[in-house]
């Protein structure tokens, strides 16, 4: 790409004006999107306007439409809700209201509108756009605008960002706010679990979501609920009997609590609402259990946005500005969506239509179709939920297999959820499942035991590694490991862990030449805070670590804001992998993030100091700098701290903070619980097929490359890749993959921190179509 093309982004918005508004129900992460739209808009040379109070502000005009500055969006990244206000607006539904809105935009020369809201808000925006030329001619006839103004504003570009905690918009895997709402729900479920266990209670929890069961479904997966009611898939006619039998079975197996999740729009097969109170009365009447109802309500909309929502909002905001400024009169109004980990642009009305089709299918009791229209991600959640929640584990049948599961490497939140899912899916398949303690030391020392259904009860929400996790590699102990594989008749191995799990897998492949016992299928599920396992864009545990860093950075920024003129240098974990530092930098609004993958010199450090000196002259008198622990052996945290302290003398003072092992702990986030659960299920389904395939002459013999794989998320799908094929994609010295997708987000971090850099626009999304997208949609 030429320098001219690079530089084009800096002048893309010159002479243009963008208005940003939030409409409908608020959602955490909207502020991140507003901030990104404002800053990237200003970066491209455009003028950016806030529209306060949603469409009402657009109709009322006046002070409701104000020009935004770089500083006006500072310190809003970590705030929930929407700082610019939102309102349900009746006026905009009438043509008269839209006429006034058009007048307000034309007078300010605004021809680009970024709308952050739900499907109703986005439909309103599309109507506005389609009427635009008629509205202008009416205004001109009425003498409210001149012919010149009408020509200057001849067409209106519209881009939508979906902000809704319900995740009810078709065409995107996640809407802004959904992950944070799941955080709120999970925090409450975890808190309720402890009291329910103390009193042997049953809790019925009602979660929001209107006519979409996403929140209820994912919550039930991430807390291991006994039953879930969602509108898309009403229970069978005799569900009352099934539910009561299920609850009493759980109690007989030794569980001290039952959790039932009810989506607020839940209905039965006849369309009759299922209420939380109704479910409670049923349980009390039939079983006599001590039962309580908790309606979570608006708590779910509140609180601090999660790291996921801040990054999602920021990425979507950048993409929205690019889509607006690249728009022509012929480009349809589009919505920026997330597919897997990729930003895509989809025609707004196609998405709205499919979203309406879901509601129509549910109204007409075509529930299977409603499920399909929600997309593959929703279907997958439902399939895994049904597997884990609704089946009594069968007794191991003859011809069953024995699969062992272990944790390798440093502990990561979500490992236990992956173990639970692996064990239970294995048992459901009718197989024997063994758990191995202390990583590869376990099979060497024979620390292996059989796991039953209850063995992993309640593991989903527990952090760390309950099986014990060591970094030891298997090579030195091949003889003992082989002996124990034979002794315990292990026919398949699930390895949940970080880079050591991957290198251990490579050693097992190598060892097959000497030891026939090692010729069994194995699969590696990446689980490490560092997110440095080749073959996967995400690792279990990285999201939890990211949220821990974010929370800490928020507190540190608050301290710095109170002190004024203070810069904090924070060291994050990750080995040589800069994922945590980069993503936390994006989510916490850092001024710089130093990483190994992007070499830096003393001149870069000097430029950062000068940048902070300039920043201290503005109204924002604080700085936040992140440094990955191994980004440079000489430019240590102490060195950078000393440099900043010296160079900033008299202008700002510096403090340093090494976050350390707190990043490995904590209760797993909903994302990690859900991701781990689905990875475990997917791995065991693969394992069952692979063992059958490798069964020869009365024993398992697997020596093909595809019998030892890493299960990873790649762009939009979960894929199995042979460990041997990943070798040439790995930098073994620094324990990182040679190519990492998140490096493309680095320029966004720098632009949002006000650096004068060139933005490569070639990476931006192109317009796709929803039907085509759905067939290749992410399976996560």
Swiss-Prot record:
Protein name, per record: ATP-dependent 6-phosphofructokinase, muscle type
Top EC group: transferase
Binding residues annotated for substrate, in chain numbering: 164-166, 201, 208-210, 264, 292, 298-301
Residues found modified as N6-(2-hydroxyisobutyryl)lysine: 557
Changes after translation: GlcNAcylation decreases enzyme activity.
Molecular-function GO terms, alphabetical: 6-phosphofructokinase activity; AMP binding; ATP binding; fructose-6-phosphate binding; identical protein binding; metal ion binding; monosaccharide binding
Chain intervals for the UniProt region annotation (Interdomain linker): 391-401
Listed EC numbers: 2.7.1.11
Pathway(s) the chain acts in: Carbohydrate degradation; glycolysis; D-glyceraldehyde 3-phosphate and glycerone phosphate from D-glucose: step 3/4
Entry-linked PANTHER family: ATP-DEPENDENT 6-PHOSPHOFRUCTOKINASE, MUSCLE TYPE, PHOSPHOFRUCTOKINASE
Lineage: Eukaryota, Metazoa, Chordata, Craniata, Vertebrata
Modified residue annotations for N-acetylthreonine: 2
Segments for region (C-terminal regulatory PFK domain 2): 402-780
Keywords, sorted A to Z: Acetylation, Allosteric enzyme, ATP-binding, Cytoplasm, Glycolysis, Glycoprotein, Hydroxylation, Kinase, Magnesium, Metal-binding, Nucleotide-binding, Phosphoprotein, Transferase
Gene: PFKM
Top-level division of the source organism's lineage: Eukaryota
Catalytic activity of the protein: beta-D-fructose 6-phosphate + ATP = beta-D-fructose 1,6-bisphosphate + ADP + H(+)
Residues of the active site: 166 (proton acceptor)
Subcellular location: Cytoplasm
Glycosylation sites: 530
Residues binding beta-D-fructose 2,6-bisphosphate, per UniProt: 471, 528-532, 566, 573-575, 629, 655, 661-664, 735
Regulation: Allosterically activated by ADP, AMP, or fructose 2,6-bisphosphate, and allosterically inhibited by ATP or citrate.
Similarity section: Belongs to the phosphofructokinase type A (PFKA) family. ATP-dependent PFK group I subfamily. Eukaryotic two domain clade 'E' sub-subfamily.
